[in-house]
A protein has these predicted regions:
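A conserved mid-domain beta-alpha-beta active-site/ligand-binding segment of alpha/beta enzyme cores
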Residues: 159-213
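A structural signal for short, hydrophobic/glycine-enriched beta-strand patches
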Residues: 2-169
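Short, low-complexity, intrinsically disordered N-terminal peptides in bacterial proteins
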Residues: 1-5, 210-213
Length: 213
């Protein structure tokens, strides 16, 4: 199989394929991908939720593109697309997916907001990890995952860096079991074809995002 065949297997695995429905809030997870903010705005305009929390400070990969922080730039983009500022809450301190949820929860509690359901909006290949992390850290929250509908080829074209996307895919796959083993996320079934594709991509050198195990 080609590297793109293997990447497609990982890409399909990470997406939860949840049916969209109305929820109390949206949580837009910060990253290098402004498409998260744009998709969140699309769903808001469809009436899927009345309140958006954009969560994220900076990672080393986002400082240049979002110098004032991921949440700030996401909020500005959503406003440009017609979301009123009164519907946007910014959580500007999270530096990882776990903090996206713990700090968002704490912020909402301080504001007297107690959601029972949420739409988690992320990069397409972050869906499963975000879902597992939220299940572990905020188990009473009823969540669905959503991302801008894109093929892998279209997503790579939108980011403009194939190797970066493929390295992120491999790294996020490994994090499914590493974070579960560390207690940061719930365990997720990893099918054999996903493990085989992951190992083949590692063998092809896509290891820049691999964690020590």
């Amino acid at each position: 199989m080609s590297v793109m065949d293997d990447a497609q297997i990982l890409w399909d695995y990470h997406q939860m394929h949840h049916e969209p429905r109305n929820t109390d809030i949206a949580i837009g997870l910060g990253s290098h991908d402004i498409g998260v903010a744009e998709h969140t705005a699309d769903l808001y305009r469809q009436g899927r939720f009345p309140l958006i929390v954009f969560s994220g400070a900076n990672a080393p990969t986002t400082v240049e593109v979002f110098p004032r922080g991921e949440a700030v730039h996401y909020g500005e983009r959503a406003e440009q697309l017609g979301v009123p500022d009164t519907a946007i809450v910014l959580e500007e301190h999270a530096r990882n997916t776990g903090e996206n949820f713990t700090l968002t929860r704490a912020l909402l509690e301080r504001e007297g907001i107690h959601p029972t359901s949420a739409t988690i909006i992320s990069r397409p290949y972050q869906q499963r990890r975000a879902f597992a992390t939220c299940q572990q850290l905020w188990p009473e929250l009823d969540v669905i995952c959503s991302s801008r509908p894109q093929t892998l080829a279209d997503y790579i074209a939108s980011i403009g860096d194939r190797d970066r996307v493929l390295n992120m895919l491999v790294g996020d796959t490994q994090r499914i079991w590493v974070y579960a083993n560390q207690g940061f996320a719930t365990a997720q079934l990893v099918p054999d074809d996903v493990l085989v594709a992951y190992e083949r991509m590692l063998g092809r050198g896509y290891a820049l995002r691999i964690l020590p195990e």
